[in-house]
Curated annotation (Swiss-Prot):
Subcellular location(s) per record: Mitochondrion outer membrane
Protein name, as recorded: Mitochondrial import receptor subunit tom20
Entry membrane topology: Single-pass membrane protein
Organism placement in taxonomy: Eukaryota, Fungi, Dikarya, Ascomycota, Taphrinomycotina
One MF term in the entry's GO annotations: ATP hydrolysis activity
Quaternary data: Forms part of the preprotein translocase complex of the outer mitochondrial membrane (TOM complex) which consists of at least 8 different proteins (tom5, tom6, tom7, tom20, tom22, tom37, tom40 and tom70).
Chief localization: mitochondrion
TM spans (from-to): 5-22
Keywords associated with the record: Membrane, Mitochondrion, Mitochondrion outer membrane, Protein transport, Transmembrane, Transmembrane helix, Transport
Cytoplasmic side: 23-152
Organism superkingdom: Eukaryota
GO terms under biological process: intracellular protein transport; protein import into mitochondrial matrix; tRNA import into mitochondrion
Gene name in the database record: tom20
Length: 152
């Protein structure tokens, strides 16, 4: 017990000593302050760049999912639409359970089902309660992207 108390107190003293040294250098050494600012800016820029890439990747995923939905043929009769709806919802759930990382295909299935459902607002409310959050975020983005008219 005595040895562990001595080692613990030495480590605590070293940590406090380093904190005091760091604070002294930060306050009194202009070169050290510049170095800290450069590091902070570098980390901040890297974080911004990473966020831009993530946003761009998400937008590409939304576009690809909308292309999958657009290429899916939509049935015309009510019975076929009902069957199509049930198949797409089941397939979306199955895809997410089998491959949780691959949300694009699952979201495309859920969105295809949403497009043929007679009351899409109610179905979207049901999706918000039952569908996992990553897929729901993709569905929201798909709906927003599709509702905005494109200028061509």
């Amino acid at each position: 017990m005595r040895r562990s108390v001595i080692i613990g107190s030495l480590l605590a003293t070293a940590a406090v000593g380093y904190a005091i040294y760091f604070d002294y250098k930060r306050r009194n050494d202009p070169h050290f302050r510049k170095t800290l600012k450069r590091r902070y800016k570098k980390v901040h820029e890297a974080k911004k760049q990473e966020e831009k890439l993530a946003t761009k990747k998400f937008d590409i995923t939304v576009e690809e999912a909308l292309q999958v939905v657009a290429s899916t043929p939509v049935p015309s009769s009510a019975e076929e639409k009902e069957l199509f709806f049930m198949q797409q919802v089941a397939r979306g759930e199955q895809l997410f359970q089998q491959q949780p990382d691959n949300i694009k295909e699952s979201a495309a299935c859920f969105y295809s089902a949403l497009k043929v459902y007679p009351q899409p607002v109610e179905l979207f409310a049901i999706y918000e309660r039952t569908v996992p959050e990553p897929i729901m975020n993709l569905l929201r983005a798909m709906q927003a992207k599709e509702s905005i008219p494109s200028v061509e």
